[in-house]
């Protein structure tokens, strides 16, 4: 959506009904809100996602800086990541699906998928390309010239920019960040 009021109402829903508290949670669940609405329109019942896939490969900035060079730290990072439903907004995505009576299939959080790669180090998974352990089986992907990992909300989707600007324009034109506005929505200051 591009209409400011529709974006703001969606943000309010994600904060008040789904329980999003962080800026990244709002931005990451924003497209799922509309995807689920389209699924309902067309009679879809099950949402299959790739959410949390990057956790297996340690492609976040934090993981690449702090865990990619030490095998034990990398393994511990992934064990912690996948033992916490807050990772990758999974808990909130589950709630959004429940509220809309959509079944969620999130295979990257399944123990069978976790066990595939937990004993591999960062280099084994990501050299010479990110996610090499998978990509080597799909040479047709090479033609797509896939760029290195970019967070969904920060890449060319412009979700963070569009959502942030909508709430800033509605509530506080001189704000540099939407975080304070999100907090006020959560507290009920902005109805």
Identify the residue ranges that each predicted region occupies:
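A structural signal for alpha-helix termini and helix-coil/disorder junctions
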Residues: 17-20, 140, 188-191
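ATP-dependent adenylate-handling ligase core
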Residues: 1-39, 58, 62-72, 121-125
């Amino acid at each position: 959506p591009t209409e400011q009021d529709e974006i703001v109402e969606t943000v309010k829903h994600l904060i008040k009904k789904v329980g999003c508290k962080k800026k990244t949670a709002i931005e990451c669940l924003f497209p799922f809100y509309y995807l689920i609405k389209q699924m309902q329109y067309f009679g879809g019942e099950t949402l299959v996602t790739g959410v949390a896939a990057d956790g297996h490969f340690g492609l976040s900035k934090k993981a690449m800086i702090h865990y990619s060079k030490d095998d034990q730290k990398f393994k511990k990072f992934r064990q912690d990541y996948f033992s916490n439903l807050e990772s990758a907004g999974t808990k909130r995505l589950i709630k959004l699906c429940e509220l809309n009576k959509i079944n969620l299939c999130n295979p990257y959080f399944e123990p069978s998928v976790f066990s595939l790669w937990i004993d591999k180090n960062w280099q084994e998974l990501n050299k010479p390309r990110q996610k090499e352990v998978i990509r080597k089986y799909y040479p047709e992907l090479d033609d797509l010239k896939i760029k290195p990992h970019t967070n969904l909300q920060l890449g060319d989707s412009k979700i963070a920019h569009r959502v942030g600007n909508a709430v800033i324009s509605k509530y506080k034109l001189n704000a540099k960040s939407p975080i304070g506005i999100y907090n006020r929505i959560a507290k009920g200051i902005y109805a």
